[in-house]
Amino acid sequence: MDNRFSNIFNLTEDQAIALFKQPLDIEDGTSERYVGAAHLINFPTERSIKALIEAVEDRDPALANRIARRKAVESLGRLKATQALPTLKNCLGDTDPLTVENAVWAIGEIGTEDESLLQAITNLLTQPHQTYRVIIQTLANFNYLPALKKIASFTNHDDKSVASAAISSVARLNDDYSHMPAVAEFLQSDDINVRRACIQDLIDAEYYPAIASMAKAPISVAFRLRGIRLLAAKGLASEKITFATIEPHLDRIIRDRPQDIDLVHEYDQPPSLDFLIRELYHTDFGRCYLAGKTLLEIYPQEAPEALLSTYQEEAHNDYGAHFHVVKLFGLLGYQPSQDLIVEALHNTSPQFQKSRAAAAISLGNLQSQPAIPLLKQTLDTPIFDLKYACLLALEQLGEDCWSEVINDRNLLIKAKAAYKLDPQTA
């Protein structure tokens, strides 16, 4: 789990516990309790775990306390606090569904062989208003076969993210993957949450036939890249797939051209330029990709100025739109954007990380020879997608740097380098 923001306030253990135990009736008590609960994950001590358990056992019905309890439950899971399992088991009967959800997840993180605990989780599948997806995933991760029949009853659930988890879990528990194509089809769902969710289910089932569809799914590059990286790691280790199988799809994700995406949306009439620019700010990346593709097709002459204008006004501070704008400048071949793209390449703010890889690809698309030294310097980065993008861009600029990363610590960069130097190795 990404812990970059876990201790952004630099709290000590004493300070975190003090915040966590603030009375509910003081000013800002709500947020302070929550912050304290969140920050105790930085201190895997008996004292912190005891404080978190005490917080979970405090059943004051006030909203502030309920919110803090949920976070305390989550923190116990992240700390893998086995001594908290009895307390977490009691949470399975809580009237707050979000507390129940967090308790199930936390038990999954901690691990258990307690049959009564696993059965208690299974029984939640018969109760209304529960987060069935998390329950199903947790039971499958425990390989708990007694839950199979109950899980199977959710394979046609109205909530397709639940159905996806159920189909994937049944496949894993039964060792029968004949119905997994249905999960891959969810990559084309109208619901962005279903598209995102099924990526995890394809990973959990180690369903390699979905790699090509995953690479073209209309969701954020971060979801697709995570999916293919985890599947590749498992598949290469088990020798169920080769790097040659993965390479074109991995390259497609890193290049992330909207014309390579299998879109789920369409326009009933040609949209205006202003409308397409606004669509780049949408949280559903499927709509962003459709807008980008349409900009390239209908407004190749007008788009650069419009993109530059929206960048200066708003996109420079919106990490989603920033990513699309940086990428589109390269695809449009807009040479005046080079300084802006170089700035994006060097932007180390975590929320703009995707834009750094997009910037590298754009510099390659712009055939920017002056960028070659900058791209080579950036090869020192530990960030996978940025390094991979720099290597692709350098290759596009006539610079073969694969021999320099043949011993890279990242599995896929090392495999790519070996494949480029000797295709027979894959």
Short names for language-model regions:
Residues 32-33, 65-69, 100, 132, ...:
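Residue-level detector of extended alpha-helical repeat arrays and alpha-solenoid scaffolds
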Residues 36, 72, 103, 135, ...:
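Conserved hydrophobic register position within alpha-solenoid helical repeats
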Residues 200, 229-230, 274-313, 317, ...:
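Non-catalytic interaction/regulatory modules that flank or connect domains
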Residues 10-24, 43-60, 81-93, 112-125, ...:
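Amphipathic alpha-helical scaffolding segments comprising HEAT/armadillo-like alpha-solenoid repeats
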Residues 31-42, 67-75, 102-105, 290-293, ...:
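Non-membrane alpha-helical segments in proteins
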Residues 319-361, 373:
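Alpha-helical adaptor scaffolds
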